[in-house]
């Protein structure tokens, strides 16, 4: 398991480095990071405040309302991007937003949630509560980046599949 996870993490950072070579690559990477962060925060805030039916036994603290909150909060970075792109006339901000970006945010949120559930599943199998001790109370570093890893890998696969088909 740790070998597979190490490979996925390496693949994530290699693809992230590749993305940053593109003209707007840094903005795209920051955008993906923001979507993942807002998705995590939205799931936590809405899940804790609304509560409700549990999402799965794999991760018993996750609720359906939290998942919906993740999807909704994942759209916030669009507003942040629009705000900063209106303040700045820099070429970095020529990344165009349309309906596909909204769908992309929702897909990134879905990948983040799936990544979180997959890591939770493996933690349950290994009978481990936290993946590390560096961030007490947060489940470790891996719990902070599990969604990001799966989001970037998902985007890589979607990108390759779409360009292969078209």
For the regions a language model picked out, list residue spans one by one.
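Membrane-embedded alpha-helical bundles of polytopic integral membrane proteins
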Residues: 1-63, 67-106
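Secondary-structure boundary/capping signal
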Residues: 25, 54, 130, 165-166
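Acidic (Asp/Glu-rich) catalytic motifs at the cytosolic membrane interface
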Residues: 36-52, 56, 64-65, 110-150
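Hydrophobic alpha-helical transmembrane segments in multi-pass membrane proteins
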Residues: 70, 74-79, 112, 148-155
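Active-site catalytic microenvironments for nucleophilic, acid-base chemistry
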Residues: 79, 83, 125, 160
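Short, conserved aromatic-histidine micro-motifs
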Residues: 90-96, 138-139, 145, 164-165
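Juxtamembrane boundary at the C-terminal end of a transmembrane helix
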Residues: 156-166
């Amino acid at each position: 398991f740790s070998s597979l996870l190490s490979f996925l993490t390496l693949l994530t950072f290699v693809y992230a480095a590749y993305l940053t070579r593109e003209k707007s690559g840094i903005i795209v990477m920051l955008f993906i990071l923001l979507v993942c962060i807002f998705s995590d925060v939205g799931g936590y805030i809405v899940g804790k405040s609304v509560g409700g039916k549990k999402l799965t036994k794999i991760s018993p603290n996750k609720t359906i309302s939290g998942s919906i909150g993740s999807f909704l909060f994942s759209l916030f970075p669009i507003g942040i991007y629009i705000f900063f792109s209106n303040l700045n006339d820099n070429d970095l901000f020529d990344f165009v937003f349309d309906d596909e970006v909204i769908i992309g945010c929702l897909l990134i949120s879905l990948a983040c949630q799936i990544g979180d559930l997959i890591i939770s599943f493996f933690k349950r199998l290994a009978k481990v509560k936290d993946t590390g001790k560096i961030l007490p109370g947060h489940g470790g570093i891996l719990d902070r980046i599990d969604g990001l890893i799966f989001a970037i890998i998902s985007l890589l696969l979607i990108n390759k599949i779409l360009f292969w088909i078209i």
